[in-house]
A protein has these predicted regions:
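Primarily auto-inhibitory N-terminal propeptides
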Residues: 2, 13, 19-139
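Subtilisin-like serine protease catalytic core
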Residues: 33-37, 161-192, 200-251, 267, ...
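Protease zymogen maturation seam
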Residues: 34-38, 112-172, 180, 184-185, ...
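Solvent-exposed loop/turn segments at secondary-structure junctions
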Residues: 87-88, 99-100, 123-127, 178-182, ...
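Substrate-binding/access-modulating region of protease and related hydrolase catalytic domains
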Residues: 163, 168-169, 239-316, 326-329, ...
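Hydrolase catalytic cores
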Residues: 215-218, 238-244, 267, 331, ...
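C-terminal subdomain of the subtilisin-like protease fold in secreted/lumenal serine endopeptidases
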Residues: 253, 264-271, 280-281, 285, ...
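Low-complexity, Ser/Thr/Pro-rich intrinsically disordered linker/stalk segments at domain junctions
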Residues: 422-510
Length: 510
């Protein structure tokens, strides 16, 4: 049985509660029709740790109300947040209150509601922490965009070879943040989204810049002559504004944003945010997303400590640390059990309102992992790879950068987008090799830009004997010198854990 409230209220308190509930309730539009289509969630799994059932009744429903409001003073502004199970989906409402007395009474009332699975008291807090940084780094361009030279992270992650395998087409990544500005480099890939704070259907407003920067890392268009490129340049971004211009907000708004993103069909949810509070509404929303087959990626925090940061610390969420250009874990990056993976997060060039800027933080590392998840989902659908375990592909293919093996600073290692795609089977799909002979030079060309080990063989009698072994250049081309005349040669791309064997047709030296 649900707890029933009894006893008289202090004079005027009943009216105050009624007013709080009347004007302070907000909830996600859970019944809204999908605006982005079906991203084939059934084709992708995210195993790892099994998240708790979001609909399991939390201890907060039966806890004494005064324990939930103990941190409030007489004049503190707060929210009483309730998570309800409505037809198998979470509905999260929030009542604005002032002071401990009013908050306690509202908590008791919400605990008695049929279908309540969690009740929380929240205060507004800062949930983002990006660090602007100037940079003059240069290097080989991965696109024709003007800021491509400054995008060292794309080269480290092997974006070019990755794009020959997948580009994010057909996938949507929700960015739950300070909103996303309508910048030219994002316009083609930016959906309308939702503004949770204002309660309107448009998340394309960012008075902070954090969310716009994150979105650009994921899906800025490539080769359009503007700015730089995102790691998944053809993925769509679903902007959800849950934090204000100062990067502050309530966990209930973030939770509502997560539920909205799931209901709108986003396959990947990026949370470049974090706090030290394990909030039941946030936990329920994250578990709802994971149970719905979504990939949830979150920053582990920038304090340089081992403190747990939520939502990164929740089971099933991919927690991301930050590395620098030298593949070292950044000094500011948090460590601990929440860290599953690391990604570039120092001097990251991306879009901001009105232009471009270089930021550092685990907030900047997180969208690289989200973008790679979108690439994996895109490849799974386009190439018919079947069920892909995103977390397993990311971790199995990571580059070891800290202590050998899995460690508390970098998790499984530094992200490699190309390696992750290969681990999922995308590299072997459709790989072909063509060989040609001219003046005793045998040239082999693969049908994609990739470095592969290739073997030159010569026919001796009825058998093929190995002559030479080398790797193709990044362009997928390798050249062998042959000496014997009137002999048949062929090139073999040997089978590996990533590729199936490919054999060219025999050629003769004339």
């Amino acid at each position: 049985m649900r707890k029933v409230i009894s006893g008289a209220m202090p004079p005027g308190l009943a009216a105050a509660i009624a007013m709080a509930l009347a004007v302070g309730l907000v909830a996600t539009p859970a019944s809204a029709a999908s605006a982005v289509g079906d991203p084939a969630h059934a084709a992708v799994t995210h195993d790892g740790e099994t998240p708790a059932d979001w609909a399991e009744v939390d201890d907060s429903v039966a806890a004494p109300a005064r324990t939930l409001t103990a941190d409030l003073d007489a004049n503190d502004k707060a929210r009483v947040v309730t998570v309800k199970d409505v037809d198998g989906a979470p509905v999260i409402t929030a009542a604005n209150v002032k002071g401990r007395t009013q908050a306690t009474a509202v908590v008791e009332q919400q605990q008695a509601i049929d279908g309540a699975v969690a009740v929380a008291v929240q205060q507004k807090q800062r949930l983002v922490a990006g660090h602007p940084m100037r940079t003059s780094q240069t290097g080989r361009n991965v696109s024709s965009d003007p800021y491509s030279e400054s995008q060292w992270a794309l080269r480290t992650l092997e974006a070019g070879p990755s794009w020959s395998l997948a580009d994010g087409s057909g996938q949507t990544v929700a960015v739950i943040d300070t909103g996303v500005s309508r910048e030219p480099d994002l316009a083609k890939n930016l959906l309308v989204g939702w503004d949770v704070i204002r309660g309107r259907s448009d998340g394309r407003d960012d008075q902070n810049g954090h969310g716009t920067h994150v979105a650009g890392v994921i899906a800025a268009a490539s080769n359009n002559g503007i700015g730089g490129a995102g790691l998944a340049p053809r993925a769509k971004v679903l902007p959800v504004r849950a934090l204000d211009a100062a990067g502050k907000g309530y966990w209930s708004d973030v939770a509502n944003g997560i539920v909205y993103a799931v209901n709108q069909g986003a396959g990947v949810i990026n949370l470049s945010i974090g706090g030290d509070t394990d909030d039941p509404s946030l936990r329920a929303a994250v578990n709802y997303a994971l149970a719905s087959g979504r990939v949830v990626v979150a920053a582990v925090g920038n304090e340089g400590t081992g403190a747990l940061t939520y939502p990164a610390a929740y089971p099933g969420v991919i927690g991301v640390a930050a590395t620098d250009r030298s593949d070292r874990v950044a000094d500011f990056s948090n460590s601990g059990s929440a860290v599953d993976l690391a990604a570039p997060g120092v001097a990251i060039m991306s879009t901001v309102p009105g232009g471009f800027a270089s930021y550092s933080g685990t907030s900047m590392a997180t969208p690289f992992v989200s973008a790679t998840a979108a690439l994996l989902r895109s490849a799974a659908v386009a190439r018919g790879l079947g069920r892909v375990d995103v977390l397993r592909a990311l971790q199995a293919s990571a580059v070891d950068v800290d202590s050998p093996g899995v460690d508390s600073r970098s998790g499984a290692g530094r992200l490699s987008a190309r390696n992750a795609l290969c681990a999922a089977g995308a590299c072997s799909y459709g790989l072909q090799a063509a060989a040609s002979m001219k003046k005793r030079k045998l040239t082999v060309r693969l049908n994609r830009e990739t470095v592969q080990r290739v073997i030159l063989q010569r026919k001796v009698g009825k058998k093929w004997k190995q002559v030479s072994v080398r790797s193709t250049m990044a362009s997928g081309v390798a050249v062998f010198k042959v000496k014997k005349r009137a002999k048949a040669y062929r090139v073999v791309v040997p089978a590996t854990s990533e590729t199936s064997a490919v054999v060219t047709r025999p050629l003769k030296v004339r």
